[in-house]
C-alpha cells in the first residue's frame, strides 16, 4: 500500500496498489462495465514546468516521439500495430501533455491477456526504450510545429497573455506545453533524449489499469515488462510560481477583434495545504454550496429578458501550489462592461456580506443529496474511466476517493451543518480580499477612458452598499395530470434484441429495452416528426431556435421556477432539430422516471415560449458573427455551405439581421403543429420495470390528444439537395495568423440506401485517413492531423459527400495538395494493400462488437425501432458487411467517386499576406 499520510480515509478495498523495486507505482481495479474491455494509462510526473528555458515544448515533443521509434518497435510501427489489434489512432490511442505531467492512454476493446501484454510492452518502450532517431525527430518537428500553428488562435493568445498579466513572475506563465517556435525549431535528438532521460524515471511513473482482468494477471504483466527498468533519481520538481501576493493595483487592456468584451478582477492569497480530513471535506461541502448559490443568483440574472452580462464566473481556486486566487469575470455585449461588472460585483458582495437564504440552502442541499444518492445507487456499474480518474487522484496525492457508499454516509453526517451561517463563514474564509484588485479588460475595442475608467467603475462597485437577498417561495409542479391514461392497441417484442414495442390508441409509439448495464439509470429519448425538413429556401431559419425551446419554460412555469421546483430530482429535457426529426433526450433514475416523463410531456403540450429564453442568445450574436472567419476552420465552416450548395439558403449562413429577427412566435409557427400532432416515438433504455414504465407513459404521453401515427414522407421536394456542378478551386480567407492555411477536397457520393456502397465508403474513409496520415504526417511532417470523412445522407435523396483535408503551413499548400492528390491516385490505381485495409477495418469492427455494452449503444437500436425497422436491420448487419469488403471493392469505390479532377477544392489562406 502507498503512503496516504495526508488523508484520514481509506480507499475502497477493491483497489490494488503496488510498487516495484525500482520505484514505479501501479494501481489496478477490476471492473466489468463495459464488460470485456479495459484501459491502460501511464502517467509521468514530467510536464512543461520541468522544462528549462531552452527546452520549452520538449515535454510535448517527447510525447510525440513515443510514437516514432523505440528499441523493439520501429518508427511508425506502434500505431500500425495497435490498429491491427483494433485500436484506432486518436480514439483509442492517445497521449496528452500538461504543465505537471504527461499521460499515455490506450483503451483496449477486448480484455484479453495478449492485448494487455502488448499494451504494457508499448508503455515500457515509451518509458525507457525510445531511440530519438535524428531523421525521425526532424520529421516529427514538422508535426509539432503544425500542431502549434493550428492551436495558435485568438483564444490561446488571450489565455497566454492573461496568465502573464495575473502571474507575471510565475514559471507557469512562461511554460505553455506547446512551447515556442524558437525552441522547437532548435530541438534535436540529443536535447530531447536528455530531457527524456532526466524526467522519465520509474519513481515518477504511475501505471493505472482498469478493466475486466484478474488483478493478479495484471500485476504479473506489469512486473514482466517494468521490473527491469533501471531506477534513477527523481529530478527536482520546479515551483509553478512565484506569485506576488500583494500585487494589487495593476491593470491592462488586451485587444483582439475576435474577443468578447470581458473584465476580470482578481486578488491573490497564500496557498493553503488542506489535508484530506473529515473537517476539510465538511468545509469543502460548505464552499460548494455557497458557490452554487452565488452561481444560481447570477444565472437567474443571465436568464432575464434583458440580461446584464453575457457570461460570468466567480470563485477562489489554487494556482498550482503557489497561491490562491479569487477572480470575478464578467463578459458583456460591446460597450456594456460597466453594467456587467457592476452587477456581478454587487451579487458577489451581497453573498459575502449576508450569505444565502434558507430557501437557497434548501435547494442546493436537495441537489447534493440526490447526487450522492444517485452515485450510491450506481456504485456497482461505474465505468473504467471513472475509476481511472479516481486512481490518479490518489497517485497525485490530491485526495483518497472513498467510494459512493462512504461518500453518502459522510454527506448525511454533514448535512445538518449546511446552514446559511456556516456557508457564509466558509465562503469568507476561502476568499481573498478584493480591496485593490488586479483588473484586466479584453475585447475588440478599448474602453473609453482606458483601464483607469474601468478601475473607477470597479472601485465604485466594491464600495457601494448592497441590500440583503430575498427568499422566494417554491411552487408545486403543475403538470401531473394529463387526462385519462392511454389504451394500448399493439404490444410486440422484437426477436433476438428483446426490444418491446407498443402503440397507444392516440398514435404514440413506445419502445422499451431494460438492461443491467448501468444501475439506477434510465435513458429517455423522444423522437418527433419534423426537424430541418420544415425549413425551406424561403424560410431557411424556421427551426433555428429549437435548442432554445426549453429556455422559454412552460406555460405555467418559467425556466428559472422549474429549476427550483425540480431541485433534488434527476430530470431534464434538451431539444434539438435533426434533419427530419426533433429529438429530446434525458437520463434519469427509476425514482424520477414519472417526473421525467411529466416534464417532457409538458414541454410537448404546453411550451412557454417566454421571451427571457432568448435574451442571452440574442446578445451573443454580435460576438458570434465577429469571430466568423478569424481562424481557418471558422472561415471554412462559413464558406463551405454556400460553395457546395450553390448558395442554397438552407445550407448557407444567413446575415446577422436574419437571426436577430427570430423570436418564439416564429418558432411556434414553425413547430407548433408538430409538437401537437406530429408522429411521436418514445424510447426507454436502462434500469426500469417494463410494466411500471408502460403505466407512466400511458398517464403522460398516452393521455395526450390523438396525433399522426406515421412519420411524414416529406416527398414534396423537401428532400432535394444538390451538390454544386462547379469543379474548381475556391479560395477563402481567414483573419488568423499569416502562416495558417487549410486545404480540403470534396466529392459528391450518394445517400445510404445502397448498404454495400455506404459500408464501403465508411471503410474507404478510414483507409484514406490512414494513407493521408502516413503521407502528410509521418513522411512529410506537414500536418498535425489529416482528415478523411464520408457522409451518406439518410434524409436527402442521392446526397452524400466524401472529404479529405489538412491544416498546413501556407508555404506548404502546393506540396500538400500534390501529396493528397498522389495519395488518392495511388489508391485508385493500385488499391489499398491488405494490411492497410485491416488496420482500417479492425477498430471499426471492435466498435461494432462493443455496441451492446452500453445503454447508449442500445439506444441507437431502440430509439426508432418501430418507425425505422430497415435501419435497425442495417445496423445489425454492419459487421458482416464490413467484413465482406475487399481491397478490390475499395479500389472500385475510389475510382467511382474520388477522381481528383472531379473534386471541389477549397483553399483557406490568410487575408493578410505572409511576411
Where are these regions (language model features)?
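Residue-level marker for the onset of beta-strands and adjacent loop->beta junctions
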Residues: 13-14, 91, 194, 497-498, ...
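Internal metal/ion-chelating core segments
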Residues: 183-223, 653, 659-704
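Metal-associated gating/positioning segment near the N- to mid-region
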Residues: 65-73
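Hydrophobic, small-residue-rich alpha-helical packing segments that form membrane-like cores
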Residues: 136-204, 208-222, 231-233, 241, ...
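M16 family metallopeptidases and their MPP-like homologs
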Residues: 27-29, 34-51, 57-61, 76-125, ...
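Penicillin-binding protein/beta-lactamase superfamily catalytic region
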Residues: 130-131
Amino acid at each position: 500500500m502507498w503512503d496516504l499520510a495526508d488523508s484520514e480515509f481509506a480507499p475502497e478495498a477493491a483497489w490494488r496498489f503496488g510498487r516495484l523495486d525500482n520505484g514505479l507505482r501501479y494501481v489496478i481495479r477490476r471492473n466489468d462495465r463495459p464488460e470485456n474491455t479495459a484501459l491502460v494509462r501511464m502517467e509521468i510526473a514530467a510536464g512543461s514546468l520541468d522544462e528549462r528555458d531552452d527546452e520549452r515544448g520538449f515535454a510535448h515533443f517527447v510525447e510525440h516521439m513515443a510514437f516514432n521509434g523505440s528499441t523493439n518497435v520501429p518508427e511508425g510501427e506502434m500505431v500500425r500495430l495497435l490498429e491491427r489489434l483494433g485500436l484506432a489512432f486518436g480514439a483509442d490511442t492517445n497521449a496528452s501533455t500538461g504543465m505537471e505531467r504527461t499521460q499515455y492512454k490506450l483503451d483496449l476493446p477486448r480484455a484479453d491477456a495478449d492485448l494487455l501484454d502488448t499494451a504494457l510492452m508499448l508503455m515500457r518502450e515509451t518509458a525507457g526504450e525510445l531511440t530519438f532517431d535524428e531523421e525521425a525527430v526532424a520529421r516529427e518537428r514538422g508535426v509539432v510545429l503544425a500542431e502549434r500553428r493550428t492551436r495558435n488562435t485568438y483564444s490561446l493568445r488571450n489565455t497566454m497573455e492573461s496568465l502573464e498579466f495575473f502571474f507575471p513572475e510565475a514559471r507557469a506563465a512562461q511554460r505553455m506545453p506547446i512551447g515556442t517556435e524558437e525552441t522547437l525549431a532548435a530541438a534535436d535528438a540529443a536535447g530531447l533524449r536528455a530531457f527524456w532521460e532526466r524526467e522519465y524515471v520509474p519513481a515518477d511513473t504511475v501505471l493505472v489499469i482498469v478493466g475486466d482482468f484478474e488483478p493478479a494477471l495484471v500485476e504479473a504483466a506489469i512486473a514482466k515488462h517494468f521490473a527491469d527498468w533501471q531506477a534513477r533519481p527523481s529530478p527536482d520538481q520546479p515551483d509553478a510560481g512565484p506569485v506576488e501576493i500583494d500585487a494589487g493595483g495593476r491593470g491592462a487592456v488586451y485587444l483582439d477583434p475576435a474577443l468578447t468584451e470581458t473584465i476580470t478582477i482578481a486578488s491573490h492569497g497564500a496557498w493553503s495545504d488542506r489535508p484530506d480530513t473529515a473537517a476539510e471535506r465538511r468545509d469543502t461541502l460548505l464552499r460548494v454550496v455557497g458557490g452554487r448559490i452565488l452561481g444560481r443568483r447570477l444565472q437567474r440574472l443571465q436568464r432575464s429578458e434583458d440580461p446584464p452580462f453575457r457570461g460570468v464566473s466567480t470563485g477562489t481556486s489554487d494556482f498550482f501550489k503557489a497561491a490562491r486566487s479569487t477572480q470575478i469575470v464578467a463578459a458583456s455585449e460591446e460597450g456594456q462592461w460597466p453594467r456587467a461588472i457592476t452587477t456581478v460585483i454587487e451579487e458577489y458582495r451581497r453573498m459575502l456580506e449576508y450569505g444565502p437564504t434558507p430557501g437557497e440552502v434548501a435547494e442546493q442541499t436537495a441537489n447534493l443529496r440526490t447526487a450522492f444518492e444517485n452515485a450510491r445507487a450506481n456504485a456497482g456499474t461505474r465505468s473504467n474511466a471513472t475509476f481511472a480518474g479516481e486512481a490518479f487522484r490518489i497517485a497525485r496525492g490530491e485526495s483518497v476517493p472513498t467510494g459512493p457508499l462512504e461518500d453518502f454516509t459522510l454527506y448525511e453526517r454533514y448535512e445538518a451543518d449546511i446552514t446559511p451561517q456556516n456557508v457564509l463563514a466558509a465562503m469568507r474564509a476561502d476568499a481573498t480580499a478584493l480591496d485593490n484588485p488586479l483588473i484586466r479588460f479584453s475585447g475588440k475595442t478599448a474602453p473609453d477612458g482606458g483601464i483607469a475608467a474601468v478601475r473607477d467603475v470597479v472601485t465604485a462597485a466594491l464600495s457601494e452598499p448592497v441590500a440583503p437577498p430575498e427568499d422566494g417561495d417554491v411552487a408545486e409542479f403543475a403538470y401531473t395530470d394529463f387526462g385519462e391514461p392511454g389504451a394500448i392497441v399493439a404490444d410486440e417484442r422484437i426477436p433476438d434484441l428483446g426490444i418491446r414495442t407498443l402503440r397507444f390508441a392516440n398514435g404514440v409509439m413506445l419502445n422499451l429495452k431494460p438492461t443491467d448495464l448501468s444501475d439506477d439509470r434510465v435513458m429517455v429519448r423522444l423522437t418527433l416528426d419534423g426537424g430541418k425538413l420544415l425549413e425551406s429556401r424561403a424560410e431557411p431559419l424556421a427551426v433555428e431556435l429549437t435548442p432554445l425551446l426549453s429556455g422559454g419554460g412552460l406555460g405555467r412555469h418559467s425556466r428559472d421556477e422549474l429549476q427550483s421546483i425540480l431541485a433534488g430530482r434527476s430530470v431534464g429535457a434538451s431539444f434539438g432539430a435533426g434533419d427530419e426529426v426533433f429529438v429530446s433526450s434525458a437520463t434519469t433514475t427509476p425514482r424520477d422516471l414519472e417526473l421525467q416523463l411529466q416534464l417532457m410531456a409538458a414541454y410537448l403540450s404546453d411550451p412557454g415560449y417566454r421571451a427571457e429564453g432568448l435574451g442571452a442568445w440574442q446578445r451573443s450574436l454580435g460576438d458570434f458573427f465577429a469571430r466568423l472567419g478569424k481562424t481557418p476552420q471558422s472561415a471554412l465552416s462559413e464558406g463551405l455551405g454556400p460553395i457546395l450548395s450553390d448558395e442554397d439558403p438552407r445550407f448557407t449562413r444567413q446575415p446577422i439581421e436574419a437571426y436577430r429577427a427570430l423570436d418564439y412566435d416564429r418558432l411556434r409557427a414553425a413547430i407548433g403543429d408538430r409538437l401537437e400532432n406530429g408522429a411521436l416515438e418514445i424510447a426507454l433504455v436502462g434500469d426500469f420495470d417494463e410494466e411500471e414504465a408502460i403505466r407512466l407513459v400511458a398517464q403522460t404521453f398516452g393521455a395526450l390528444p390523438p396525433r399522426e401515427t406515421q412519420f411524414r414522407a416529406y416527398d414534396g421536394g423537401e428532400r432535394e439537395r444538390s451538390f454544386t456542378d462547379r469543379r474548381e478551386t475556391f479560395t477563402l480567407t481567414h483573419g488568423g495568423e499569416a502562416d495558417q492555411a487549410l486545404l480540403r477536397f470534396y466529392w459528391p457520393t450518394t445517400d445510404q440506401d445502397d448498404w454495400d456502397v455506404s459500408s464501403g465508403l465508411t471503410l474507404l474513409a478510414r483507409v484514406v485517413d490512414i494513407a493521408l496520415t502516413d503521407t502528410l504526417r509521418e513522411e512529410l511532417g506537414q500536418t498535425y492531423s489529416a482528415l478523411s470523412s464520408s457522409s451518406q445522407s439518410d434524409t436527402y435523396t442521392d446526397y452524400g459527400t466524401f472529404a479529405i483535408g489538412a491544416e498546413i503551413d501556407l508555404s506548404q499548400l502546393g506540396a500538400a495538395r500534390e501529396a493528397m492528390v498522389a495519395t488518392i491516385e495511388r489508391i485508385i490505381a493500385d488499391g489499398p494493400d491488405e494490411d492497410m485495409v485491416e488496420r482500417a477495418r479492425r477498430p471499426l469492427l471492435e466498435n461494432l462488437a462493443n455496441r451492446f455494452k452500453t445503454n447508449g449503444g442500445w439506444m441507437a437500436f431502440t430509439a426508432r425501432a418501430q418507425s425505422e425497422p430497415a435501419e435497425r436491420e442495417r445496423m445489425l448487419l454492419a459487421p458482416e458487411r464490413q467484413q465482406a469488403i475487399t481491397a478490390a471493392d475499395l479500389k472500385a469505390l475510389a475510382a467511382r467517386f474520388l477522381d481528383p479532377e472531379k473534386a471541389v477544392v477549397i483553399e483557406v489562406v490568410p487575408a493578410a499576406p505572409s511576411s
